[in-house]
């Protein structure tokens, strides 16, 4: 079964704030392997539209920097888990997350 993970980006790094991220990286993983990935421009979207992007793309996990309580609550109510207060190069953090999934 596949799983989608989203990482808000600022350049190649995890965006310091979910609500100000200009880009969203969505990665589809199946049996521990990446089978698809895409990057969406979200700079023009308001907060509710950003949340809708996650649900409409069937994201199950979000890895992000700072995120406000409203967004955490909204995502949690939709069954999306959030790993927050994470900083660093997005690809490095994603690979660590993926490695943990394979254990």
PLM regions and their residue ranges:
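N-terminal basic/disordered segments at the start of proteins
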Residues: 1-22, 26-27
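Short secondary-structure boundary segments
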Residues: 9, 65-66, 86-87
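Compact, glycine-rich, soluble single-domain proteins
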Residues: 37-56
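Short Gly/Pro-enriched loop/turn and capping motifs at secondary-structure junctions
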Residues: 45, 67-70
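Conserved functional loop/turn residues at catalytic and ligand-binding sites
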Residues: 58, 66, 79
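C-terminal structural segments of small proteins and small subunits
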Residues: 69-103
